[in-house]
């Protein structure tokens, strides 16, 4: 039979093993709010048995190792959601600025249009009122300024987005370089039979940060962890990183290039960088087109109706706004063509007190 010392040794060994397990639990609790931390578990194994007098006795328990608990599918889902979050937040911030441009009642185009039609309505009640005529010209110039301010504000947003592209690319390159280094450390520790849990946690957190910046794909290969863009452009392979580049080249705008020199700007869809490029390359051009179309169509329609009337001297009406032959840069070139209030063609029959043409001009508000 085993002696007292053997029994005591088994008991001590059991206490040490379970103390180690308690330490793991305490460490898990302490790191509950640590970004990237993965819960660890203690692996307890039966100690080697021993024989005495042809009888086999148990050797107790040993603490084999600590092991991080990872759900790879859940981790990939976190990366996907983080990409979407980065993309959505970037677009929301940019669109909030755009909304301010058009919804501002004091400076927005919509508010300026309403104010302009209000002054036309007031003039229609007394077409010979010089002050009311001057108010129409003043509000018309305010409308022109609102178009110019909208163009300037959209350009400012676009410039800010464009400048952020190389900054985001630099962030991506720093993260991929750090991830590649940690990849090498993980491989080295695994080769030595060590548990790389802490290093893997650090790597997972960096990958999460990276996924907030761009759409990435994470795969485990025989060479270790591999990161690519969603379209397969390599970012990290084992302990080697591949830096992206951002430059304008022959373009006015910043483009993103792979380490091999391929323009991958259009391939980047997710993360902050994807959101930035989507607003810059798709949303803003559409807004410029809509703004220019509005300026061109409004100026053309108003000029056509204005020319159908007569001014205070009984002369045929002329262009009220500067003619805009094309929609290109129409908002930037929008302006008032007349400076003399008496040239406002209020009359429909040439008589001084007629407001017939003004009523037709006011009716354009509903078109």
Region spans (language model):
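S/T-rich, low-complexity, solvent-exposed segments of bacterial secretion/appendage proteins
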Residues: 1-367
